């Protein structure tokens, strides 16, 4: 199993490190083999450049690439979507990434605010399969294409039959799944403790036992924010008409739900060993280098013998 740290080519992440060697030394200190990289545009201080121009990133650092996924996509132009995702897939091929992560979900700003979905899991899955098959068909990509769960309609691991529907309708040979532990926990608003979270995950794995070999990667983190969601839904909410204010509202709300904190409960190591993935990513949202180091120290400690 290869272990990675999530990273982006955004200014927020890049400014934390002085050089490639500084970044490499940092993640190796916590036992990571490399990065799962999200290729945002790189800002050089004057203008935006392609992510490949980021001076911190060398191909030998990159184990996986996380596609820059569009959450509200089902009504968007197909050619636009294919062009958008092919940039990330071509980048992954150029960087010799071993896998790519792709969200299988559909959620608009309004759906995220109201928790009233407009589509069923099956509708999203079948639409995603059509897009993915068009995206990958006729290509010679060498990497695994791994589909990740969220807590919105689509892949959410709530029903093994729906998970199977996704896998059965993808033509790409090197297909698989990413289990994002924190995302799955958001499907149960009653969870209060990491112990309860771990039991909930293991129950899902029991139900998906036949499909466990498809889980090639884990995004390991947790946040127990059911009380926040219940309080949120108890009050009337409205989205601003101003695009920048609307963006702020949506992202503050999403980050309040999905906090990406270290998963440290006794039994986390056994959960990972049960799945036996090829890749494990410590996927955290942090404010600075010091907080990232603290989270990595805490999260990796569950694997110490």
Please tell me what each predicted stretch does:
Residues 1-12, 33-37, 61-67, 100-102, ...:
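Hydrophobic faces of well-ordered beta-strands that scaffold small-molecule active sites
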Residues 53-68, 125-140, 169-170, 208, ...:
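Alpha-helix-loop-beta-strand connector modules within alpha/beta enzyme cores
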Residues 1-87, 304-305:
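N-terminal pre-domain/capping segments
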Residues 1, 82, 86, 96, ...:
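Histidine-acidic metal/acid-base catalytic patches
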Residues 9-11, 39-43, 67-71, 106-108, ...:
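Active-site-proximal loop/turn and secondary-structure-junction residues that shape catalytic pockets
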Residues 15-24, 46-53, 125, 153-172, ...:
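Distinct, well-ordered alpha-helical segments
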Residues 13-17, 74-79, 110-119, 155, ...:
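Short, flexible/disordered intra-domain loops and linkers
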Residues 78-176:
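Active-site acidic/histidine proton-transfer and metal-coordination neighborhood
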């Amino acid at each position: 199993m290869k272990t990675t740290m999530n990273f982006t080519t955004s200014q927020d992440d890049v400014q934390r490190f002085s050089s490639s060697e500084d970044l490499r030394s940092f993640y190796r200190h916590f036992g990571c083999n490399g990065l799962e990289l999200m290729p945002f545009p790189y800002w050089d201080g004057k203008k935006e450049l392609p992510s490949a121009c980021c001076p911190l990133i060398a191909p030998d650092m990159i184990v996986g690439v996380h596609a820059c996924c569009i959450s509200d996509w089902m009504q968007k132009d197909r050619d636009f979507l294919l062009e958008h995702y092919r940039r990330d897939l071509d980048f992954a091929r150029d960087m010799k990434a071993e896998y790519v992560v792709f969200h299988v979900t559909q959620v608009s700003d309004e759906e995220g605010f109201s928790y009233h979905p407009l589509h069923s899991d099956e509708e999203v899955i079948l639409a995603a399969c059509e897009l993915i098959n068009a995206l990958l068909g006729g290509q010679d990509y060498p990497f695994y294409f791994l589909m990740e769960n969220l807590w919105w309609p689509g892949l959410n691991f709530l029903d093994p039959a729906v998970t199977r529907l996704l896998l059965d309708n993808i033509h790409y040979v090197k297909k698989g799944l990413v289990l994002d532990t924190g995302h799955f926990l958001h499907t149960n608003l009653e969870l209060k403790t990491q112990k309860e979270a771990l039991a909930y995950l293991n129950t899902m794995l029991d139900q998906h036992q036949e499909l466990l070999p498809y889980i090639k990667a884990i995004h390991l983190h947790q946040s127990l924010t059911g009380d926040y969601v219940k309080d949120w839904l108890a009050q009337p909410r409205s989205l601003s008409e101003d695009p920048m204010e609307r963006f702020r509202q949506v992202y503050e709300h999403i980050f309040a739900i999905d906090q990406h904190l270290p998963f440290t409960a006794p039994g986390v190591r056994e959960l990972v060993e049960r799945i036996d993935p090829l890749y494990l990513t410590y996927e955290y949202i942090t404010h600075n280098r010091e907080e990232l180091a603290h989270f990595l120290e805490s999260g990796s400690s569950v694997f110490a013998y």
